[in-house]
């Protein structure tokens, strides 16, 4: 078959299963109220949990960073691209999120995907065993695959099953890998148990706090701080394009671990550093996150989460047991989920349909993503509209 025809057939198969993904075009800044594809909508799609993506303080820091450093870094971090802005940000991130370690150090990455690949491929390799939660993010799954380690998938959130697998493993290097807040269900991993298991079995514990950083814990310091957890075995990955409202990611761990990543993590070494202006904006974001304003935004987000759960129960949906900003509505089939999304979209509400392979087959869902930028009036609009997709999805 012609190579192009093979792809065309593959796309036709995707269409037949109701799995084609489509991009929508935003004409305005990320926020609760946006213009998307030329229409005014209320967005429940972004991960801008604190509503900082268009914050004037961050925008000005970004602009000032560009005026000072220019538009690009010019090279990789190890070949001329590591600016004072990057170095300052890493020090700030280590101080902000490294309370679990006696000697924390941070390493900044352009994306969360690259950060997870770096941590897993540098710490594991042939002869190692990675124990990965069944619902981990794709970047953790790919990092485990690329590491060439043996990979064992343990049932979602099941610390007892993980313990049994660790006891049966005699690999010299073991890594437990888990999201903290799971991005499609909104539930939280049993972090205290995972830390205890890592220490008992002499394993690294790599946690991806993409959806907890900035939101959970005192001053938004993340899921580990929320639980008061400390361990030299911890490797913490945080994302800066969600609650922080900018872009990039970071790894915080003991300084020896970070130096190892600098020397061995290919997704850090062999790529151009992010523009310094991005680091400047993230530094400004950290200041807001840790401030009284950050506390107020987290409190408002918490109230929105509570109200949303009440709305879902009142409108006869069966909400997943999530007390985070991710509120999924599991529908089941791809077609019914797409119909539900379209019904909401017709009423000016953007609530994306999440389908396989992002979630397991038969669990397609609407994913309501809440932000401190939302108002209770926005939730009232959502409440009034939720009756329509029930009929469409039935």
Swiss-Prot record:
InterPro entries found in the cross-reference section: Aminotransferase_I/II_large (IPR004839), AON_synthase_class-II (IPR050087), AONS_Archaea/Proteobacteria (IPR004723), AONS_Proteobacteria (IPR022834), PyrdxlP-dep_Trfase (IPR015424), PyrdxlP-dep_Trfase_major (IPR015421), PyrdxlP-dep_Trfase_small (IPR015422)
Record-linked Pfam families: Aminotran_1_2
What residues does substrate bind to? 21, 137, 358
GO MF terms held by the record = 8-amino-7-oxononanoate synthase activity; pyridoxal phosphate binding
Q: Which cofactor does it need?
A: pyridoxal 5'-phosphate
Q: Which domain of life is it from?
A: Bacteria
Give the EC number(s) listed in the UniProt record.
2.3.1.47
Q: What does this protein do?
A: Catalyzes the decarboxylative condensation of pimeloyl-[acyl-carrier protein] and L-alanine to produce 8-amino-7-oxononanoate (AON), [acyl-carrier protein], and carbon dioxide.
Q: Which HAMAP family does this UniProt record tie to the protein?
A: BioF_aminotrans_2
Q: To which protein family does this belong? A: Belongs to the class-II pyridoxal-phosphate-dependent aminotransferase family. BioF subfamily.
What protein am I looking at?
Answer: 8-amino-7-oxononanoate synthase
Q: Which gene encodes it?
A: bioF
């Amino acid at each position: 078959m012609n190579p192009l025809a093979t792809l065309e057939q593959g796309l036709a198969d995707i269409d037949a299963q109701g799995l084609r993904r489509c991009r929508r075009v935003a004409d305005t800044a990320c926020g609760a109220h946006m213009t998307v594809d030329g229409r005014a909508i209320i967005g429940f799609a972004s991960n801008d949990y604190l509503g900082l993506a268009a914050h004037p303080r961050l925008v000005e820091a970004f602009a000032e960073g560009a005026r000072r450093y220019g538009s690009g870094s010019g090279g990789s971090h190890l070949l001329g691209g590591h600016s004072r802005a990057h170095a300052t940000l890493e020090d700030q991130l280590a101080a902000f999120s490294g309370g679990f370690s006696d000697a924390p150090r941070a390493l900044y990455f352009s994306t969360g995907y690259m950060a997870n690949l770096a941590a897993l491929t540098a710490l594991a390799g042939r002869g190692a065993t990675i124990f990965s939660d069944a619902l981990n993010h794709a970047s953790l799954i790919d990092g485990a695959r690329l590491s060439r380690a043996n990979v064992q998938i343990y049932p979602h959130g099941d610390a007892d099953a993980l313990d049994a697998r660790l006891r049966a493993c005699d690999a010299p290097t073991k890594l437990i890998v888990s999201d903290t807040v799971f991005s499609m269900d909104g539930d939280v991993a049993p972090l205290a148990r995972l830390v205890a298991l890592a220490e008992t079995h002499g394993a690294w514990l790599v946690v991806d706090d993409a959806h907890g950083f900035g939101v959970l814990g005192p001053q938004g310091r993340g899921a580990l701080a929320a639980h008061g957890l400390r361990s030299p075995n911890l490797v913490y990955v945080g994302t800066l394009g969600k609650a922080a409202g900018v872009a990039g990611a970071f790894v915080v761990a003991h300084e020896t671990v970070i130096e190892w990543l600098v020397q061995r993590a290919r997704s850090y070494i062999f790529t151009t550093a992010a523009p310094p202006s991005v680091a400047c904006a993230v530094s400004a974001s950290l200041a807001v996150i840790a401030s009284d304003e950050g506390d107020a935004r987290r409190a408002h987000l918490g109230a929105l989460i509570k109200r949303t759960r009440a709305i879902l129960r009142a409108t006869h949906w069966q909400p997943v047991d999530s007390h985070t900003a991710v509120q999924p509505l599991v529908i089941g089939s791809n077609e019914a989920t797409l119909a539900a999304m379209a019904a909401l979209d017709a009423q000016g509400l953007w609530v994306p349909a999440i389908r396989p392979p992002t979630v397991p087959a038969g669990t397609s869902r609407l994913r309501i993503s809440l932000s401190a930028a939302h108002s209770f009036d926005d939730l009232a609009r959502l409440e009034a509209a939720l009756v329509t997709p029930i009929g469409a999805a039935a």
